[in-house]
Amino acid sequence: MIQNHLFQILANLAMEPPPRTDSESIRDEKVKVLKAIPPLDQKNIVRGQFRGYQNEKGVAQDSKMETFAALQLEIDSWRWKGVPFYIRAGKCLPVTCAEIVVRLRQPPTMYQGFNLTRNDFRLRLSPEVTLAFGMNVIAPDRITSANARKW
């Protein structure tokens, strides 16, 4: 799943606007994204197997087949420089879903020195399509604190 579906979603999310809306222009922009991913460092890759997988019907008792993979990568471009992308996929996880979570850069410390969390947005593609936002909220009359909110 990581090598096809999730990279396709990553390319769609991170590509620059194509000069035209024909399929070749869109494909070219996606290819630019994929080519801008530097080689992965082993310390940014996690692989595993869910407990009990070797007891599944048709699975060898000594199977080393991964049922989970997670990786952190970056895209070497002006827009995404320094923004980590996390891709995870696996079987038998606590939540069954396909989603994209984008954590935006840390806000500047211009808001009266508040220790602000990073804003994010979440696009869940399955089991149902939802869009959620997590952001810092500073009420006009509150000058001493900020609250992280999720919608």
How would you label these PLM feature ranges?
Residues 1-151:
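Secretory/organelle targeting and membrane-embedding segments
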